[in-house]
Amino acid sequence: KRGRMLVASYEAVKFQKLDLFTVTLRQIGNCIAEGQLLDAYAALIGVHDSGITLEGGLTYAGLVDLWNAFEGFNMTTLLVSARDTASILKMTEMQDAIAGNDFHATGRVVTPLGAELIKHKMFPDNTILALDRTCALEKVQAGDVVTDFDKLIDRQLERASITAIAGFSPIFSGAVQMLTHA
């Protein structure tokens, strides 16, 4: 269960502009989604006992080996720390002139072997988790996002809680591969 609570005085709610409330709710949604991403990562990392280990640093050859480890699945997504993302994007194989133009024009980053890079500060350094997002993980959700409002008259406050109940269950262990490096 993930959620956030918004507490404001009655006057602040009454006189606020709708845009501010919308922005706040959107940010609360982002916080819930970030928590669910970390829950999904924990479920995926628990499935995989071993993987590819590189003795040296991260190399393009190591990424190719990771891609090649998928038997009957496609590597569609890489869950990577910020430091490892920078290492990947600095590889000479990623510094294509046409790809650079695409990045400047659209903001889309060139990704290794067509996989989407998802970076997060909480993902561990020196570990890359690769997955086939179509069959690696199931999200089990209990209902929709729940929003509850409460008025505390004695304190003249209004509270709003936004919660989502979800869990993650691995489907096929072969759809998840892990690469660790020094």
Predicted regions and their residues:
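Alpha-helical scaffold segments that mediate packing/assembly in large oligomeric complexes
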Residues: 2-74, 181-182
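Structural beta-strand/beta-sheet cores of well-ordered domains, especially the beta-sheet scaffolds
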Residues: 2-4, 73-76, 113-115, 156-158
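Sequence/fold signature of self-assembling virion shell proteins
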Residues: 93-182
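Short loop/turn segments at secondary-structure transitions that flank enzyme active sites
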Residues: 12, 38, 84-86, 166-168
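Charged, low-complexity, helix-prone segments enriched in Lys/Glu/Asp/Gln
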Residues: 32-40, 84, 134-138
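Short helix/loop capping segments that flank catalytic or ligand/cofactor-binding pockets
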Residues: 16-17, 87-89, 169-171
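Helix N-cap / beta->alpha transition motif
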Residues: 9, 80-84, 132, 172
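Extended, solvent-exposed, turn-rich assembly/linker loops in the middle of proteins
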Residues: 44-114, 120
